[in-house]
Amino acid sequence: MKNVLTILSILVSIQLNAQTRIIVDVNGKGDYRTIQGAINSLPDSSATPRVIFIRKGVYGEKIYIEKPNIIFEGEDRKATIIIASIARDEWRCGHTDDWGVATMNVGTNDITLKNLTITNNFGFDFKEKTIYCASDTTANKERNLRKDGHQMALRTMNMATRLKAINCHFRAFGGDTVSPWEIYNGMWYFKDCIMEGGVDFYCPRGWAWAENCEFISHTGPAAIWHDGSGSKDSKTVLVNCKFKGFDGFMLGRYHREAQFYLINCEFAKNMKDTPIYRVQTTNTINWGERIYYYNCHREGGNDFAWYKNNLPADINAKDISVKWVFGEASVLSRLSTRSWMLSWTYDTSKPKVSPYTMIQS
């Protein structure tokens, strides 16, 4: 009897831990032709991750993700493309919030993106357009859509947190391409990604880590942005990242409380000699200017003085890790963050940071 119970226990454990895997193929050779169809087929919740494997192809659809614990894995980053054309200025004329403003709209926790290109192509395929907009402040209620207006490829809402993107390409011409927004519990992890767009095209709120990422600025007065107003500990950390763009592109700015750390980053030689700056608004900044650099350089040399090493005295570059970033955030969220407990080790013989390793805790 004891052996029977043991076997049953093992079988139940295997069943509970079995990972659901759905295949999406735009040509009809999978379980679903559309990504949204695959999402809709899943139960509303799950204790273990569900995998939606997306085969090569162009998926012309706007994605809404409201079910947690899903891994979206593309077959090939360059060939697995999710694309939609959305101008935020037009969307908000008929909607009271941003739900649906992006190519990928995330309203839940524990979402992982792998090997995908996610594009909002409104600005790339721009055609002049004037629309009627009931909420517009002009007398005739007409609004001219702009090529460089807000065009989100990724937008999180509804207090979503713990999103990871690995080897993904986020594309837009206009602003706010990558918008993970949740100031109190937001935890965002990006590795080996490419992000491109206009003003503030990488604009996390809360806690964010970006490693080995490339940022391409098409237009606008800043590439990166941060809102850390939910907690003094909030921060955006960029490690081993590269920045390039149009001649005279500017690195970053902020409107609210913010905290930036740039470690081992490389800037293109055509970047403007302008530090990350505060935009003057009526917002009160209580925690001061907190913009830190370590071992950052300009392509070809001739570095600008404003990004010289300036880490706080109590912080060593080798201690800056994923675990360091999300430590207090994990307490605030009151949720298990085992999969977030990652760190990298520092080899003093090399100028760069070694690949991260998982910490089992």
Residue positions per predicted region:
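Sequence-level preference for short, compositionally simple segments enriched
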Residues: 20-361
